[in-house]
Amino acid sequence: MIIDVATYTDGRREEVDDLAAALERCRRGERGFVWLGVHDPTAEEFEGVARVLHLHRLAVEEAVQGHQRPKVERFDDVTFAVLKALAYYEDRSAVETGEVMVFTAEHFVVTVRRGQLGDLGPVREALQADAHRLRLGPRAVLHAVMAHVVGGYRAVDEALEQDVEEMEEQVFSPARTSDAARIYSLKREVLEVRRAAAPLVAPVRALVERGEAPPGDGSAHELEHRVERGLAHG
């Protein structure tokens, strides 16, 4: 379902009633972009969007089906990013995952959320309050989304680190107990964080090197740091 759709010109938001007409206005004026946000779209719902924006068939299928490996790919003039959103539930020592996918081109960005995690409302609100960043266009949205998702990795990583430290204290205490199942579970969750972050490091670096990252963007360095933390725990 469509969560939000608007155009942004010189950092100002305008509501959109007709996606195709809004996109044409942005292209004709050679400024501004459309930002469409959807959640758990069906094939039928996304078909119309894909037709208007001329999205690549393979990327559309992946966005609708979900369960994709984290990556950043290029289809003609559209960048397609797949990100894993993570949350850690300490009561059951479990990392839950969701998916966030982002299509970006010169005059549009489409954010697709699958599952309950990865709410992008705070990202849109933060950007709408920062006209300077919005003027950078869809690339600013892409990297704000990346920073938001990676921030979730940080929270999960820190929670896992605390649990690992507690387990180590128990193992080496005089009254230590053997909890092989929990140790195995924690190691499995550490791997979940690594699987989410590791595939993104190289493509995010490439975005920065190609000049597709906003000036001063730190997503690549943050991703590298998250992977290093996961490796340290492994």
Predicted regions and their residues:
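Peripheral, non-transmembrane regulatory/ligand-interaction domains of membrane transport proteins
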Residues: 1-222, 226, 230-233
